[in-house]
Amino acid sequence: MTSTLHSTSFNTTRSKQVFARAQSLMPGGVSSPVRAFKSVGGDPVVFDRVSGAYAWDVDGNQYIDYIGSWGPAIVGHAHPEVIEALRRALEKGTSFGAPCVLENELAERVIEAVPSVEMVRFVNSGTEACMAVLRLMRAYTGREKVIKFEGCYHGHADMFLVKAGSGVATLGLPDSPGVPKAATSATLTAPYNDLEAVKALFEQHPDSIAGVILEPVVGNAGFIPPQPGFLEGLRDLTQKYGALLVFDEVMTGFRISYGGVQAKFGVIPDLTTLGKVIGGGLPVGAYGGRREIMEMVAPAGPMYQAGTLSGNPLAMTAGIQTLDILRRPGTYEYLERITEKLATGLLQIARETGHEMCGGYLPGMFGFFFTAGPVRNYEEAKTSDLQKFARFHRGMLERGVYLAPSQFEAGFTSLAHTEADVEKTLAAAREVLSTL
């Protein structure tokens, strides 16, 4: 790969044609809003194939990819061991609709790794996992109200589309048309990292809050880590008021550490949602937690939840192989080293080129904002210079670096990214930032 790809040679003719056709076939031309490049301008590039740390579009342009299918590709795209395992699984069938041994094998790995999980249920997406865990919180406690945090995204279910992040933040929507007031009337919101606001909600509703759900490290409003004591404070508050604490680790699970945020920070929730990495690039989700809570889920208990393709052999196979790769010695040390080099390099170059920028990283996950910061919550994230981010994104794209097309999304590194990839990325960033 050449060190940079300049705009004079950046041809996206075929991508434009494909996207133009897509807009007559699908709403906005995409299957998920952020892919349409609405917040950064211009037409999206249309991918043709991916391998390792790289993606190629239909015009033949090559990119260093820092989205990684929005998180699942932590071992790199199309990892040979994952592809071979899937090839063998395909020969046995794509979906059984019946129990299979692969479910046991992935469940055992999840339970072994994630401190809060004593039992697990597989579903087909992170949204589905969060929908089910919300129902379970209410079923177990007999209470209805739930606290979520502004800018935290837990999927597109009605009850979570209140001050949500991810695509909702990208489009600047406070919620979504079509969501009845009744669906969100029991959803309480607080600023992320604001323990006093959560205390106030519990004081106002001491006996009616089923639990608190959050991204323990926010990735759907940009990268925002928890302040010291915040997660611990939530654990104490929920225990004090008899409520449940739920970590949405769809993004962070098996990424920032093998056991997720809860293992790295030492704060153990009652329930956890998972997705992305545990499917190795195939559609998957899961929720799990304490045995006494999970035994409420049908058919063991009265709380109903089901899915035609849940636990399908292909997703289970890809997940098993991906987790086995991640368990190898040195994995997360490498992810931390490569992510640190990228994230600290971007901040240094921004300073040297005269731009206000703040940001941070954890192994395999990073983010930055065009503001002096600090950014501790969604409101502070919105102070970022979105026009500058859009110009930066375009400049990087033209130079062969694919970043998330939204200021309000985290970036991801993988085991396939090399120091040379990071150096090329930083060289491109210096070139772009010098012109903004």
Swiss-Prot record:
GO cellular component terms given for this protein: cytoplasm
EC number: 5.4.3.8
Protein's pathway: Porphyrin-containing compound metabolism; protoporphyrin-IX biosynthesis; 5-aminolevulinate from L-glutamyl-tRNA(Glu): step 2/2; Porphyrin-containing compound metabolism; chlorophyll biosynthesis
Any one biological process term the GO annotation gives: chlorophyll biosynthetic process
Modified sites of kind N6-(pyridoxal phosphate)lysine: K276
Subcellular locations according to the entry: Cytoplasm
InterPro entries, A to Z: 4pyrrol_synth_GluAld_NH2Trfase, Aminotrans_3, Aminotrans_3_PPA_site, PyrdxlP-dep_Trfase, PyrdxlP-dep_Trfase_major, PyrdxlP-dep_Trfase_small
Keyword Cytoplasm: yes
Top-level taxon in the UniProt lineage: Bacteria
Cofactor: pyridoxal 5'-phosphate
GO function term, MF aspect, one: glutamate-1-semialdehyde 2,1-aminomutase activity
Known catalytic reactions: (S)-4-amino-5-oxopentanoate = 5-aminolevulinate
Predominant localisation class: cytoplasm
Pfam families the UniProt entry points to: Aminotran_3
Cross-referenced SUPFAM superfamilies: PLP-dependent transferases
CDD domains per record: OAT_like
Keywords noted in UniProt: Chlorophyll biosynthesis, Cytoplasm, Isomerase, Porphyrin biosynthesis, Pyridoxal phosphate
Subunit: Homodimer.
Family: Belongs to the class-III pyridoxal-phosphate-dependent aminotransferase family. HemL subfamily.
NCBIfam families: hemL, PRK00062.1
Protein name as catalogued: Glutamate-1-semialdehyde 2,1-aminomutase
